[in-house]
Structures are given as C-alpha cells and as structure tokens.
A protein has these predicted regions:
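Hydrophobic "anchor" residues on beta-strands that sit immediately upstream
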Residues: 61
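Phosphate-interacting basic helix/loop segments used at nucleotide- and nucleic-acid interfaces
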Residues: 45-55
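Structural scaffold elements adjacent to functional motifs in cytosolic proteins
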Residues: 64-65
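Rhodanese-like catalytic fold shared by cysteine-dependent sulfurtransferases
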Residues: 1-45, 58, 68-107, 115-199
Length: 199
C-alpha cells in the first residue's frame, strides 16, 4: 500500500485471541500533542534497547515514564518518574510544572511501543530541551531484546488487549488484571489491599 513502505511490523504471540474484534481506521494522527508536534520534522535521539541501561544509569539523566498512571501501576524502569497522568496529552502540563530546560539537561523518555515517545520527545525539543532520548521500539522491544538478568525493568508491562500485562518474557502475566469497575490494571498488591472491592 502506498505510504506504508517504511512500516515497522511488530508481532506478539499469545496462547489465544487477545482482541474481541479488529478495526482499521485512517486518522490524521495516532497520538495527539497538538498540530505543531511533528516527529517527522524533529524527534529525540533513538536509543537501542541494548544501550538503554547505560543511558538511564547516567546520574544527569531524568527518566520519565510517559504512559498513563494505570499503565505505570503494572511496572516501570527503576528510578523512572511517574508523572501520574490520566491521558498522554496531559504530559506537557507535568513537564511545564516540574522540568526546566536550563536545569534538566538530559531527559530520557519511554512508553509501551515507542509511538508516544516520538511525539513527546519532539515536543520536548520544541520547548528548548537540548538532549532528549527515547527507547527505540519502546518497552516491548526492550523486554524482547534485553535478558531479564540484565534488565532495569521492574514488574509487568501493561498492554492494550485481553492479556492486560506481559512479563519480561512477553508472556501473559498473572500479576496485572483488568478491573472493569475502574478500567485500570490492578497488581496483586492492589487487589489484596483492604480497601479493594472487586468489580
């Protein structure tokens, strides 16, 4: 199909069906941070999964999890800042309130598959941040390529299908379960809390 020549196809295996249905739509943008943010024009530096650990261990690097709060509950990288956002489009508000390009010289960002980080790093560069990095292929590519024994990832990775979460080997996780009441992924610890009410 014209325009899809450079499409990066990703395959993920599961023991059964993980989607009730599939729908394909053409949209002007997949992730929205405003019309002026175009990662095709300006984007942060891609960091291969094998090089990610060295980057995030640099004490000058501010590591930001760009995912929504319910995704972060399932797992994240050691030392990552959780901006506690409800929607990705709220990330700029967090950055404007907590980060400063003159103080925070190096920023590394990550998300599930890398799409949100392309947008967020483009936006960060437009705000004057000079060194902005993001994990190429996102968390899922990191889990696929970096052995668990060398991993800086803790917990599961929330995914947007019936699996809810996958472990470091990309197998469906028993730790994170979907709560139909709040619509979030709940860890075992959250489900064992005294205030937890099923449903």
């Amino acid at each position: 199909h014209p325009g899809l020549e450079d499409l990066q196809h990703k395959t993920s295996h599961a023991p059964g069906h993980v989607f009730n249905r599939a729908k394909v739509k053409v949209k002007p943008t997949l992730i929205n941070l405003g019309p002026e943010v175009d990662p095709n024009q300006c984007v942060g530096t891609y960091v291969k999964p094998r090089d990610w650990n060295a980057l995030i261990r640099d004490p000058e690097v501010v590591l930001i999890d760009t995912r929504n709060d319910y995704e972060v509950h399932a797992g994240s990288f050691e030392g990552a800042i959780d901006p506690k956002i409800k929607r990705f489009r709220d990330l700029p508000d967090y950055v404007q309130e907590h980060l400063d390009p003159s103080t925070h010289k190096k920023v590394a960002m990550f998300c599930t598959g890398g799409i949100r980080c392309e947008k967020s790093t483009a936006w960060m560069l437009e705000q004057g941040f000079e060194e902005v990095y993001h994990l190429e292929g996102g968390i899922l590519k990191y889990l696929e390529e970096v052995p668990a024994s060398e991993s800086a990832w803790k917990g599961d990775c929330y995914v947007f299908d019936e699996r809810v979460g996958v472990d470091h080997d990309l197998n469906p996780s028993d730790s994170a379960k979907f709560c139909p009441g709040c619509g979030h992924a709940l860890t075992i610890k959250m489900r064992c809390a005294p205030e937890y009410v099923p449903g």
